[in-house]
Amino acid sequence: MSDKTPRKPTAFRLEQPARVSAASEQEEPRRPRAVKDLEQITPQADVFDLTDDEAAELEILDPAFEAPERKGWSLSRILFGALGILVSFAIGIWTEDLIRALFARADWLGWTALGVAMVALAAFAAIILRELVALRRLASVQHLRKDAADAAERDDMAAARKAVDALRSIAAGIPETAKGRQLLDSLTDDIIDGRDLIRLAETEILRPLDREARTLVLNASKRVSIVTAISPRALVDIGYVIFESARLIRRLSQLYGGRPGTLGFIKFARRVIAHLAVTGTIAMGDSVMQQLVGHGLASRLSAKLGEGVVNGLMTARIGIAAMDVVRPFPFNAEKRPGIGDFIGDLARLNSDRNARK
């Protein structure tokens, strides 16, 4: 044991100067009081934004469209078919007479002409075969569109799976759809309602293509709008609108996996023109025209720039019509683009150009 005596218990006070000083220096809460002369910030209205009524009016002017199926032979088809047969006979007889005449003059000339004719015939047959394959692909896309709409309407799971498999086959060579196709592959053994499967395939596979298609339509509309604003002649405007519209239709068909040939492109163009003829002209409603050339933009856009906006909107309508025709599935889960999606960008583009002048 230790010899030291234990210390007696004593009381002592703990000093906490930091807490005491912090508590003493704490400010008293401010008493509530009324504040006058509040600064109000009023957002400036954008003259390029459409109201709900104007947007609804544009949607009415550009409804969705399904081309009716043609049955039987029309008089125009019979006429052009008969003329085509006559022209083929004429070319064949002319070629035969030419080869006979060359054989009569010199054998080597006749054999050379015959070889050239055979090469031309083989190339022509290859072109016809390629066009027939492209037309068959186009017809399959149109049938797929109808089958997908029927499967979604009837909620038929078997028909929906068949339509989705066809869509995956069409999109197999499109890199943007790889992620969506992998997702659908993982759901092969799952039980999904037919309508939900159609909507899922549209969302996962066609959504990236729809975004790219909107970009293509917007860029084409901007180019037409700018060329119209700077071109000195109306004939140049018309020519460029036709050129840009044809290129837009072909690029949209290639984007969605159509890959049309020459005849397929002509058929696409005819269906797009039929779309525009059925859904109405490019004429705007009263409220939209007032916004374009009246109250909102009259002080911002010159007459030439206003024409650029209208031509750009016409190109946008052609692009939307082309999307309706070449898209494998109808718009169901995704929102169908309308004129209102492009009018603001076109008006701002021309307004900025006018401001820089």
Swiss-Prot record:
Region (Disordered), start-end ranges: 1-36
GO cellular component terms, semicolon-separated: plasma membrane
InterPro entries listed in its UniProt record: DUF697, UPF0283
Record keywords, A-Z: Cell inner membrane, Cell membrane, Membrane, Transmembrane, Transmembrane helix
Compositional bias per record (Basic and acidic residues), positions renumbered to this chain: 27-36
Cellular compartment(s): Cell inner membrane
Membrane topology, from the record: Multi-pass membrane protein
Residues spanning the membrane: 78-98, 109-129
PANTHER family recorded: UPF0283 MEMBRANE PROTEIN YCJF (PTHR39342:SF1)
Family note: Belongs to the UPF0283 family.
Name of the protein in question: UPF0283 membrane protein BMEI0952
Species: Brucella melitensis biotype 1 (strain ATCC 23456 / CCUG 17765 / NCTC 10094 / 16M)
Upper taxonomic lineage: Bacteria, Pseudomonadati, Pseudomonadota, Alphaproteobacteria, Hyphomicrobiales
